[in-house]
Curated annotation (Swiss-Prot):
Gene3D superfamilies, sorted: Uracil-DNA glycosylase-like domain
Coarse class of the protein's main subcellular location: cytoplasm
UniProt subunit comment: Binds DNA as a monomer.
Keywords assigned: Cytoplasm, DNA damage, DNA excision, DNA repair, DNA-binding, Hydrolase
Protein name: G/U mismatch-specific DNA glycosylase
Gene behind the chain: mug
Subcellular location per the Swiss-Prot or TrEMBL entry: Cytoplasm
Amino acid sequence: MVEDILAPGLRVVFCGINPGLSSAGTGFPFAHPANRFWKVIYQAGFTDRQLKPQEAQHLLDYRCGVTKLVDRPTVQANEISNQELHAGGRKLIEKIEDYQPQALAILGKQAYEQGFSQRGAQWGKQTLSIGSTQIWVLPNPSGLSRVSLEKLVEAYRELDQALVVRGR
């Protein structure tokens, strides 16, 4: 089981779709060697060094957290049903209401659209929010994603810089 890493006062909570089998096997988020999450958040400025999956708890030192929409591990995210994503969205809203980070970053348009019953999502900041928490949709860093590392870093950096502008 991959546990959430959450605390009050976070700048951002990154929300993946669900754990892959590598993460489920190790208990660490974004654990597959092809997953670019740790490299991207470092290059985008969220951390001052590239953390390893087994150092995930250190995200809290940078006022970052991680969670997921669905607990069930799969090989690919497309194995998750729309019903599971929608139910996960309801649970996620409760978590975010409890912790109220400055931003919630949903990693993937489909995850956001299905989890929050939205259509036509664009990358970046959304008009929908949860209390004072901004919702952002960022490209998924999975190794299966066709988005280039450069584009991932650019999208994540936009969020990091927006939080700096907000004074967080």
